């Protein structure tokens, strides 16, 4: 890693949760970084991303937790993005090489996207390099052994909104639909899938690569077990003629 008068920030995707899914380049940069910035949602909790990285590096590291609260209030979020950007700039402008770690891929529904935009607006002289990571839905497909698309099939990736906006249209338009940010909306999603006779064409993978990982090939069975919406991805294969069981 080349040293500069002003350091550089690396935005690093660390994958879905399994430390072994960290890419070689990501691990190399993390091992060489002077300081690692870790996002967390709860003021008093720990950073999940940090707990993953702490198991992969033996070199002494300076860790800095950056809080990004779980809220949709843009005014509140912008204040935290600016605070995080200032904290990063404070260290990187000293010549330190920094790594901001994020689950999955940095450019897929990641806090890093907003942080990068804030850095560009307020600290344009700081060099930033983004390192891709394995996304949750890629890992979910691999764990469940489900091809995402083949031939001329089309795929959509959607976050689940409270009103399920756009889901019905996606199921009618695409061959494969990936549902992310399922969370507490799982019951509503299941009801829609049942209405469209898609429960047996859907697979849910939760806590991918983590202790307690679950792979459920028939969502109708979710009624008999604990609901698993948190940290989950649902893959719906509309084009499959056979059930995914």
Language model: regions and residue ranges:
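Short, acidic/turn-prone active-site loops that include or flank metal/cofactor-
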Residues: 16-17, 41-44, 68, 153-162, ...
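Class I SAM-dependent methyltransferase SAM-binding "motif I" and its flanking Rossmann-like core
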Residues: 108-172, 224-225, 238-242
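Short gly/pro/ser/thr-enriched loop/turn and capping motifs at secondary-structure boundaries
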Residues: 43-46, 71, 135-138, 186, ...
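A contiguous loop/helix-start segment that scaffolds small-molecule binding in enzyme catalytic cores
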Residues: 9, 171-245
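Short, surface-exposed amphipathic charged segments that create phosphate/polyanion-binding patches used
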Residues: 76-85, 143-146, 170-173, 215-222
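Solvent-exposed alpha-helices and their adjacent loops that cap or buttress functional pockets
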Residues: 2-5, 28-29, 92, 100, ...
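Class I S-adenosyl-L-methionine
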Residues: 1-19, 24-26, 31-127, 190, ...
């Amino acid at each position: 890693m080349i040293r500069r008068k002003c350091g550089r920030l690396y935005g690093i995707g660390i994958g879905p949760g399994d430390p072994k899914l960290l890419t070689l380049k990501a691990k190399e940069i993390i091992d060489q970084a002077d300081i690692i910035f870790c996002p967390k949602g709860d003021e008093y909790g720990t950073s999940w991303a940090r707990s993953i990285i702490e198991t992969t590096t033996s070199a002494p590291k300076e860790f800095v937790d950056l809080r990004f609260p779980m809220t949709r209030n843009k005014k509140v979020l912008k204040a935290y993005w600016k605070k995080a950007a200032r904290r990063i700039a404070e260290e990187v402008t000293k010549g330190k090489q920094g790594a901001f770690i994020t689950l999955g891929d940095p450019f897929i529904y990641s806090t890093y996207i907003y942080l990068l935009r804030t850095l560009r607006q307020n600290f344009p002289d700081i060099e930033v390099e983004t390192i891709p990571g394995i996304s949750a839905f890629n890992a979910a497909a691999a764990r469940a052994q489900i091809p995402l698309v083949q031939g001329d099939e089309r795929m959509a990736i959607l976050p689940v909104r409270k009103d399920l906006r756009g889901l019905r249209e996606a199921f009618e338009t695409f061959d494969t639909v990936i549902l992310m940010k399922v969370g507490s909306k799982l019951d509503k999603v299941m009801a829609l899938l049942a209405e469209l006779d898609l429960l047996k064409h859907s697979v849910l993978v939760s806590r991918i690569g983590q202790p307690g990982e679950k792979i459920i090939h028939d969502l109708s069975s979710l009624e008999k077990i604990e609901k698993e919406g948190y940290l989950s991805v649902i893959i719906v294969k509309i084009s499959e003629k056979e059930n995914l069981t």
